[in-house]
């Protein structure tokens, strides 16, 4: 039997666009009430007014660094019996990022495997989060407000599960430095504030198991090591003992290696899988 044809970049993009439309149609037909309920359950978490500190609930936080997609980690962690909360590396202005245009970054991959996209596109969520950002880009560093959506259905390989989602945009370091000449120290400070706000959101919503990753380290141009070290410092200081388990899901191998080096005492797993892409949809 001959191997399937390997798609080039443009063919993959067209395939992703087609699957995005399929997800949208399927969700509208089969999950309309659930989408409405999730939209109503989504809450805006404003930026903390003071430096947040987490509740101490556990003697130690178990940390694992995995080479896999966020969706892979969601499926794996829920199969372990955990209630899971995952960070969506979101667009500041556009629900789902470039989901309908065929891109496949972290946010888009979440949308391909869930009903997250129509929830983010709902009128209520748009007005709650995206509309308030118009004209308020903060020199491309954006703001530390975010959305919390509980129990979003995800599916992969015939398995359906649920995970709560924190939708938050990282500082766009590349744009901030290219167009606004923002210095490194202010970019780092913005990322420190953003990560503290993400962990605060998970804490106040009583989440114990988090899936994080190389937040903002793609087109936004943040440094993987710096982001990993900020997460480490927050989890060892202000949020020490706040979470039972934290998984860093990093699909790109070089970024995985850097992340793993920052957490030498953590469990490391290289999970060789095909590139994260279109996923089969759940049942009615």
What are these regions (language model features)?
Residues 1-210, 214-284:
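Macrodomain-like recognition of ADP-ribose-binding/processing modules
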């Amino acid at each position: 039997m001959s191997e399937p044809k390997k798609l080039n970049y443009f063919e993959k993009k067209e395939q992703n666009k087609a699957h995005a439309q399929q997800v949208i149609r399927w969700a509208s037909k089969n999950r309309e009430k659930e989408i409405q309920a999730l939209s109503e359950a989504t809450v805006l978490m404003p930026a903390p007014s003071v430096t947040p500190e987490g509740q101490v609930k556990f003697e130690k936080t178990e940390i694992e660094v995995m080479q896999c997609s966020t969706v892979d980690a969601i499926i794996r962690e829920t199969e372990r019996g955990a209630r899971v909360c995952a960070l969506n590396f979101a667009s500041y202005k556009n629900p789902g990022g470039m989901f309908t245009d065929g891109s496949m970054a972290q946010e888009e991959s979440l949308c391909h495997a869930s009903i997250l996209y129509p929830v983010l596109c709902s009128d209520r969520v748009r007005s709650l989060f995206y509309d308030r950002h118009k004209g308020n880009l903060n020199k491309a560093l954006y703001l530390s407000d975010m959305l919390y959506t509980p129990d979003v259905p995800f599916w992969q390989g015939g398995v359906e599960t649920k995970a709560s989602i924190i939708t938050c945009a990282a500082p766009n370091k590349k744009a901030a430095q290219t167009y606004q000449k923002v210095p490194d120290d202010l970019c780092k400070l913005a990322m420190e504030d953003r990560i503290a706000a993400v962990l605060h959101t998970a804490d106040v919503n009583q989440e114990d198991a988090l899936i994080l990753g190389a937040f903002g380290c793609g087109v936004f141009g943040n440094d993987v090591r710096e982001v990993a070290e900020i997460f480490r410092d927050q989890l060892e200081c202000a949020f020490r003992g706040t979470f039972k388990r934290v998984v860093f899901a990093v699909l790109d191998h070089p970024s995985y290696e850097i992340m793993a080096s920052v957490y030498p005492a953590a469990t490391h797993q290289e999970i060789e899988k095909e590139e994260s892409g279109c996923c089969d949809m759940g049942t009615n």
